[in-house]
Each structure stands twice: as C-alpha cells, then as structure tokens.
Amino acid sequence: MYALVEINGKQYKAVEGEFLKIDKISPIEKEKLEFNSVLLINKDGEIKIGKPYVINSSIKCTYKEDKKDKKVVSYRYRRRKSSERKVGHRQTYSYILVDEIVF
C-alpha cells in the first residue's frame, strides 16, 4: 500500500513503514506529523485518485532527524579574464517515518 502526498509544494511517494526524505521542516512542525493533501492511494491494486485531493484521507508520520546531503559544487570559469568562481552548497533534509495511511 502506498500513497502520493504533497508536502511543501512537492510530491512524494509514501509507503507505510518506510522513511521519506523531504525538504527541511520548521521546528514547530516536528514530533507527530499529519499530512492531509493526499493525491492518490493504491491499496492492493485498488486505486483512489483525488480531484485534486482524496477526501477524508491523511498520512501520519513521525519525525526522526535532519541530515545534510552531499555537497554540490558550482564552478564558473571565464577564459582569458583571470576570473573564476567556485561555490559549494549542502541542502538540509528531514527524514520522517510513515506510520499509517488513513483513508
């Protein structure tokens, strides 16, 4: 059983008992989480599609931790100008455990 859920404007596939890697959430929202914007639910081949969301459905999750992803390096070099720029970025993600899909 899985569901497609919209969290902070992005869509994720949520499976019961598995972790979701989402963009960092604010400290106020941590602890027990519940997301009501479920787009699709698939249970044993029976598919429910929302218009745009499935009515009376939600996903209950538990916050686990924040982690940083691998560093992404952006490098720009201008030939014959003696100019170059190197910038690194590490995105922070929150890991949440999907406890239950309710519908």
Swiss-Prot record:
Pfam families: Ribosomal_L21p (PF00829). GO terms for cellular component: cytoplasm; ribonucleoprotein complex; ribosome. Keywords: Ribonucleoprotein, Ribosomal protein, RNA-binding, rRNA-binding. It comes from the Bacteria. GO terms for biological process: translation. GO terms for molecular function: rRNA binding; structural constituent of ribosome. InterPro entries: bL21-like, bL21-like_sf, Ribosomal_bL21, Ribosomal_bL21_CS. PANTHER family: 50S RIBOSOMAL PROTEIN L21, LARGE RIBOSOMAL SUBUNIT PROTEIN BL21M. This protein binds to 23S rRNA in the presence of protein L20. HAMAP family: Ribosomal_bL21. Part of the 50S ribosomal subunit. Contacts protein L20. Belongs to the bacterial ribosomal protein bL21 family. This is Large ribosomal subunit protein bL21. It comes from Borreliella afzelii (strain PKo).
